[in-house]
């Protein structure tokens, strides 16, 4: 893995897990809006590190914990995981001994996919991500709902470093067709499983609710996958700050209102 930090190590720590096809630097726009109050840690998965070999989620978790210890981090104010980063974040949450105060999943890809299907997915995902490097980001609209210039550098960097073997190994132990790992009830109460109502991953929401009945489930009405984070990193950072400091979401105009029981 490769690690970047933003902010003062003496401040409360926020750990990010990035989405598929990008590097950890993709969290920089949000982290820079948090750096005055928090110490932000941005790992890049071994999958997107040139010269490194992905050895499994347990090894990724070990590397993250080793780095946190080297920085003197003894607890985490917040874990933020985007898309497939939710898969690794969940492994981290169930294995780490570090206290974690809050968790925010942004469009978590809580898919449970059979082994044979995951094997078929590998060449398609590999070519999609490599094409972003080869085309200098021009093919982004083919794999994403947007093609914002601001996010293209993260896809290009990931595509440049990606090797087929690492993609194959990651899909071997990610998005597995297994029950979701258990989370203590108290952890669930401070965990936000957010989905945009317009994103494909929204279809996983009900399954996640059944697995984690004490979690928080905000829905961003009309929003696409990670749209708030991508289009408004300052607003997204302010939302995360509210979660850490007040244990609640701020008023958001696109937040779906909960239906009251009759």
Give names to the regions the model predicted.
Residues 4-50:
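Conserved HGGG/HGGXW glycine-rich cap/lid loop of the alpha/beta-hydrolase fold
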Residues 32, 41-78:
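Active-site loop/oxyanion-hole signature of alpha/beta-hydrolase fold enzymes
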Residues 114-116, 131-185:
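Conserved alpha/beta-hydrolase catalytic His-Asp/Glu region
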Residues 172-210, 219, 228-229:
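Conserved serine/cysteine hydrolase catalytic core
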Residues 223-235:
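Catalytic histidine-centered segment of alpha/beta-hydrolase-like enzymes
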């Amino acid at each position: 893995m490769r690690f970047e930090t933003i902010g003062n190590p003496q401040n409360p720590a926020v750990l990010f897990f990035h989405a598929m096809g990008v590097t950890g630097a993709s969290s920089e726009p949000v982290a820079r809006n948090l750096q005055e109050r928090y110490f932000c840690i941005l790992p890049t998965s071994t999958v997107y590190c040139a010269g490194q070999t992905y050895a499994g989620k347990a090894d990724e978790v070990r590397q993250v914990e080793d780095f946190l210890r080297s920085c003197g981090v003894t607890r985490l104010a917040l874990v933020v995981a985007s898309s497939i980063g939710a898969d690794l974040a969940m492994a981290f949450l169930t294995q780490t001994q570090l206290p974690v105060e809050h968790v925010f999943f942004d469009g978590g890809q809580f898919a449970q996919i059979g082994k044979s299907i995951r094997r078929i997915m590998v060449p398609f995902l590999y070519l999609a991500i490599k094409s972003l490097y080869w085309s200098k980001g021009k093919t982004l609209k083919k794999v994403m709902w947007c093609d914002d210039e601001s996010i293209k550098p993260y896809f290009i960097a990931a595509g440049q470093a990606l090797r087929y073997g690492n993609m194959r190994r990651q899909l071997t132990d990610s998005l597995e067709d297994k029950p979701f790992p258990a989370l203590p009830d108290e952890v669930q109460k401070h965990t936000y499983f957010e989905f945009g109502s317009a994103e494909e991953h929204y279809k996983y929401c009900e399954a996640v609710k059944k697995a984690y009945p004490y979690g928080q489930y905000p829905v961003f009405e009309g929003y696409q996958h990670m749209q708030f984070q991508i289009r408004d990193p300052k607003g997204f950072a302010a939302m995360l700050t509210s979660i850490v400091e007040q244990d609640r979401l701020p008023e958001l105009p696109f937040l779906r209102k909960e239906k009251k029981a009759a």
